[in-house]
Amino acid sequence: MGEFFYRIRQRMRTHVLDKCKVDASATQLDLPRSSVIENPTAHLHYPIFEKTVDVFKPIDWHLDVSTGQTFPMSFAHKIDIRSDRYGSAKHVWEVNRLQFLLHIALLYKKGRNEKYLELFRYHLTSWKNANPYMVGVNWYSNIEVNLRLICFYFCWQVLDVEQLRSSNAEFDVFVSKVWLPLVFEHAEYSYNHPSLYSSANNHLISEYAGLFVAACCWNIPHRKARLKYAKAGLEREILLQNTSEGVNREEAAEYIQFIDDFFLIAAVVGCRAGIAFSDSYNGRLHAMASYMNAMLDCKCNYPMYGDGDDGFVLRPDEGGHFNNFKSLLVSFAVYFDDASFKRADVMWDDKNELLFGRTGREKFVRMPAVAAGFLMDDNSFYPESGHFIFKRTKGVAVSGLRETYLHFDAAPLGFLSIAAHGHADALSFILHVDGDPVLVDAGTFTYHTHKDLRRYFVSTLAHNTVCVNGKNQANQAGPTMWLSHYHCKVLNVGDNFVEATHDGYRMEGVEHVRRVEFNRDENEITITDTLRCSKPAEIEIPFHLHPAVSAEIQGSVAVLSVAGIKKVQMGLDPKLSYAIRDGGWYSEHFGEKTESSALYAKTNVDGFVSFETKIKVLE
């Protein structure tokens, strides 16, 4: 009943009280002159997923750059963002996170060239004019509001605003009339639109983090109360949304870097403000950092289970693809003074300079790097969380680091009742060899647009597990909503094996048990699928290939090659007839997809049946 009344109150807030605050006719401020904007040869194309926006030119803040469609200038909560009607809200929001402003602020700081300060003022004034409070799609989502608050904070620090205000009268007026009013509007929105109950996932974390950072920096209304509220929320959610083993409960690997950054940034900003978080907070954050480190292969690639949307909390660079996991290893090494996070191939970067400054940089430089393969040449099992990572890593004189990496997923579907960012991937596995993805999760590609593709990417058949009767292991009720969650159960765990089952096909009369065993001496993985059927069923078993992998099948043996080099030999069960099946999709980054293929078998089963697959990683 609590959620029922929360939804009523939320509806009252978003459709009645918020509407009273709409002022679409708000006074338009004069745009400051910008020599960069006026220069026809000046361009900086900032990546927005598969597209770009030229941040050295005026920006249409409501344009979806992926379709050319524009979202309406109407009451925010009435705008349809869950269809293709106006295009992709996700692309609009990515522009309006304003993270490119931090890059512009850094350009100003490095050379004190006034043209970049002009450009900063121009864009933020333009944004305020185009986004009156509660008008337009950029006031729809609270996570977007809080990402802007965090961006505002770091821009404020980079520009050294208080000093700049005292020496630059125009900038002082800009801060008073544009920037601070925006900060206060964002802080008000953040507090008044909490994501609770079934929505209390990473969105709620962002809301507490953004409000906490704002209250640490600015004299927002009710500052002390807001600070207390936000800090308490962060302390609570870090324990609720992450297991004691440090695994995030949303079951979306790419989101881990996003969520870890919210908690880390809040802790760092709190330290600057003299506000320390508890030992339990820091202990759980360290466990999260340790899982993240174990989850990464020897090239810091992550297993792409669950949703991923290339979202970042803090981006000081020119945008584009960025391995924030590597950056976070540096951050955690410094924050915890823990050299186990300093892999040999991680480097100091601008993001960590913003977080820790010269003191942190000097600490990191003094810290010894972990030897290649050390601490990675071992399995990392998280039975409470349902994640199992098999690793064999060694240095080879000629070819460098060699690694066999397999991630096995026996985890819940996702977090809370809707499991928004989980995929129907029970008992799926992902294989990397020498840091190259070989057998892969299909990825994400989209949320609310291209509905057929959304259904494909989250489906059971798009993962390396057994699909029964062409159905998903859970029922998808919407793009980010699952019903009838399956439950996984770990049956047996040893040093080099795990066996687990799930009940996602109970209505089909089928129980699937999968055993994964790693023979480290032979560098061979054996996967045994056992099906107990109370009635006849049709099953499909795919092994999805990374687009860079080619495959050849001869009888019951498949050989997989990466860039022409033979990497893997698969012994396929002779009871099944495997073929190379085209027509699949792989999405390494949100908004991008490429065609892919899979080793694929289909058969009818009844009663008790077992299939064995042997995966031999070639030396």
Say what each PLM segment does.
Residues 92-93, 140, 145, 419-423, ...:
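Short alpha-helix boundary/capping segments
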Residues 146, 308, 315-318, 322, ...:
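CBM-like, beta-strand-rich accessory domains located in the C-terminal region of large
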Residues 251-439, 491-493, 499:
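Carbohydrate-active enzyme catalytic cores, enriched for enzymes
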